UniProtKB/Swiss-Prot annotation:
Domain SH3, chain residue ranges per copy: 12-71
Species annotation: Monopterus albus
CDD domains named among the record's database cross-references: SH3_OSTF1
Source organism superkingdom: Eukaryota
UniProt key word Cytoplasm: yes
Positions of ANK repeats: 72-101, 105-135, 139-168
Disulfide bonds: none
Localization per Swiss-Prot or TrEMBL: Cytoplasm
Gene: ostf1
Annotated tissue distribution: Ubiquitously expressed.
Keywords: ANK repeat, Cytoplasm, Repeat, SH3 domain
Protein's name according to its UniProt entry: Osteoclast-stimulating factor 1
GO-annotated cellular components: cytoplasm
A Pfam family recorded for this sequence: Ank_4
Length: 214
């Protein structure tokens, strides 16, 4: 029994597949790819021919081939981030795969990069203008919780430099600081929280001063 065809991509949403067989094009417009290649499908508006990219080349792929002879990769960004596969992640970014997508546990790709200690992957994701720093997963954890719990102080510092929030509590009512497993992570988080508290107090004092001047 043949499996049902994949759902068409929403406008602007890139769907990703892994080719199970090699495809030999018959016309110059068609895209050649080999077994195991990653296919980025960007346009499914034509029911017969989908527009896709593979290894930096763009062309047409018969939609029935994708349906019958390709494997859907639901969360390519997450897979790349978990493995610390920088080149695949960069390819996902270049092919406009959404960077803030959530897996079944509510995690972003950045969460998995922080959880795995993949500093180069974290850096690439943090350089994307639309990256979400404060997304909570189903356990209420943020990327900062993950990095602090795993003891990656260099990643904690990178997240704090991008102004990741330190005041978010997870489902166990714990801050990232309370999840920190080494002194260096704890010190960075304390310093950042101290700065935020000082700034808040300073703002409050200015507000009171304004009241007094009325």
């Amino acid at each position: 029994m043949s499996k049902p065809p994949p759902k068409p991509a929403k406008p602007g949403q890139v769907k990703v597949f892994r080719a199970l067989f090699t495809f030999d094009p018959r016309t110059p417009d068609e895209l050649y790819f080999e077994e195991g290649d990653i296919l980025y499908i960007s346009d499914t508006s034509d029911t017969n021919w989908w527009k896709g990219t593979c290894r930096g080349r763009t062309g047409l792929i018969p939609s029935n081939y994708v349906a019958e002879q390709a494997e859907t990769i639901d969360h390519p960004m997450h897979e790349a981030a978990k493995r610390g596969n920088l080149s695949w992640l960069r390819e996902c970014v270049e092919n406009k795969v959404g960077i803030n997508g959530l897996d079944k546990a509510g995690n972003t790709a950045l969460y998995w990069a922080c959880h795995g200690g993949h500093k180069d992957v974290v850096e690439l994701l943090l350089n994307q203008p639309s990256v979400e720093l404060n997304q909570q997963n189903k356990l209420g954890d943020t990327v900062l919780h993950a990095a602090a719990w795993k003891g990656y102080s260099d990643i904690v510092e990178m997240l704090l430099d991008k102004n990741a929030r330190t005041d978010i509590r997870n489902n166990e009512n714990k801050l990232a600081l309370e999840m920190a497993t080494n002194a260096q992570c704890a010190s960075l988080l304390k310093r950042k929280q101290g700065t935020n508290v000082t700034r808040t107090l300073s703002n409050a004092e200015e507000y009171l001063d304004d009241d007094d001047s009325d």
